[in-house]
Each structure stands twice: as C-alpha cells, then as structure tokens.
C-alpha cells in the first residue's frame, strides 16, 4: 500500500496532539483512502521557509500552528474558502500539483461552541487564530471586539468591522476568548482584575490552549464562570483538515468520531 506523509508545522510543537488524532484516522480509514498516511510533528525554526520545508519533506498535506499561520497564507499557490477572508492558513494540501491553503480553525471553533446563543465576543490577541475566529464570529452575526497590547495587526480587524482596542474596553461580552500564546508560558493574557470584571459578566471564558488548566481558565473556574479549553476546537479543525487530506472521501463527522475516541 502506498505511503503518504503529512505533518504539523509549529514552534513549539512537542505539546501537539495532532499526530495522535490524525494517525488514528489514517489507520482507521486506510482501506477507504487506498494509502497509509503517516502524520508527524515538525519543529520549524522561526526563520524557515514553509513551502521549501513542505516540498523538501515530500508531504501530501500539513497543518500549520503557532506562529506560522499568517506566513502560510503567503506561500500558497491557491487559497480557498474562509482563508481568503481571514488571511491565515492552518491547512496545506497538494491538489493538482498546487499547494492549496485552507482555514479550518474558523469553522472548527464555531462547531466547538455547540450553537449557544452568544451575541458578543472579545478576542484577546491579533494573530492568525484570532483572525480566523473574528471572521467566523462576524459571519455568524456576533458583535466582535479585539483587544491587543499593540497596534500590530489591528488594521485587519478594523477593515473587518470589529471594534479594536489597545486598552481594555469598559464593556461586557458574552464570550471572552484567549487567542494569545500567554497560556503556553503559564501566564494570563491580561491584567487579573480586568479579566475578573469580564468573567463576572460573561457567559463563557474560552482558551484556545488545551490539555491543562491554564491561568486564564483557572481564574474563570475560581469565579464560577463557565469555561472551555481548545480541545474540541482542535478536534473539529483536525477533522475538517482530514476531510481535505482525504480529498473529501472521509466526511469530517466520521473523522471527528475517531479522533474523539483517542483524545
């Protein structure tokens, strides 16, 4: 049986559960796919050229995580779907000898929310994940605000129609989303007292990090604010990516079931 290689680019990457859940799917669906896929973590030096690495490794597809999603958008031969709007790519697939970029973070995040009636969201951070979330939440009719410590990247959100801030707005929000990398450094993304104010009035504190109780989620728990980590988003975006890797042979709900069973 033919072997195909896949992977996930990131820095850091050792924490990633993507290899675990994707390899479970490649093993489960190898008969339907007609090939055996192997998916591995790829630690990419910060100055690396993603496309060169992708081609050098002979990959058929890959995911892209922190801090490369915006850079991945720049190197694709073609961009499809909501990735065109959000300027960030987390899924790379070879289609007809072209490197095609998708974004499955956006829909993956929305599916992970479970269709609750949220009306407003505050996104902390302005990177590739924040862009994808802002695009999807706007599309779903929510009022989206973005808070970032610097002006870097905020022009994108302004063009999108989000309210943008460098100082914490004195407002209330249904969703407070940590899309920064602060949790990976075991830090809060924002002043503790300011966060407390948002959590007390909010309906859900959501951290894109997963696998441990982050300082952000710990504070929400302390205040008895409903909270959620990024595990379900990870699995949904991975299942949506797997659908792309399988050339739509394996619909994402089937992939999701397998991935959920191992993580």
UniProtKB/Swiss-Prot annotation:
Reaction catalysed by this chain?
Answer: shikimate + NADP(+) = 3-dehydroshikimate + NADPH + H(+)
> What does the record give as EC number?
1.1.1.25
Query: How does changing the pH alter activity?
Result: Optimum pH is between 8 and 9.
The pathway entry for this protein reads as: Metabolic intermediate biosynthesis; chorismate biosynthesis; chorismate from D-erythrose 4-phosphate and phosphoenolpyruvate: step 4/7
Question: From its record, what is one biological process in GO terms?
Answer: amino acid biosynthetic process
Tell me, what is one Gene Ontology molecular-function annotation carried by this entry?
Answer: shikimate 3-dehydrogenase (NADP+) activity
- Give the residues the record marks as binding shikimate: 16-18, 65, 90, 105, 210
Q: How is its activity regulated?
A: Inhibited by curcumin, 3-(2-naphthyloxy)-4-oxo-2-(trifluoromethyl)-4H-chromen-7-yl 3-chlorobenzoate, butyl 2-{[3-(2-naphthyloxy)-4-oxo-2-(trifluoromethyl)-4H-chromen-7-yl]oxy}propanoate, 2-({2-[(2-{[2-(2,3-dimethylanilino)-2-oxoethyl]sulfanyl}-1,3-benzothiazol-6-yl)amino]-2-oxoethyl}sulfanyl)-N-(2-naphthyl)acetamide, and maesaquinone diacetate.
Pfam families named in the record? Shikimate_dh_N
**Enzyme class, UniProt record, top EC level:** oxidoreductase
Entry note: thermal dependence: Optimum temperature is 60 degrees Celsius.
Keywords tagged on the record: Amino-acid biosynthesis, Aromatic amino acid biosynthesis, NADP, Oxidoreductase
Give the UniProt entry's GO cellular component terms: cytosol
Biological role:
Involved in the biosynthesis of the chorismate, which leads to the biosynthesis of aromatic amino acids. Catalyzes the reversible NADPH linked reduction of 3-dehydroshikimate (DHSA) to yield shikimate (SA). It can also use NAD to oxidize shikimate.
The name this protein goes by in its record: Shikimate dehydrogenase (NADP(+))
Write down the species: Helicobacter pylori
The protein's gene is named aroE
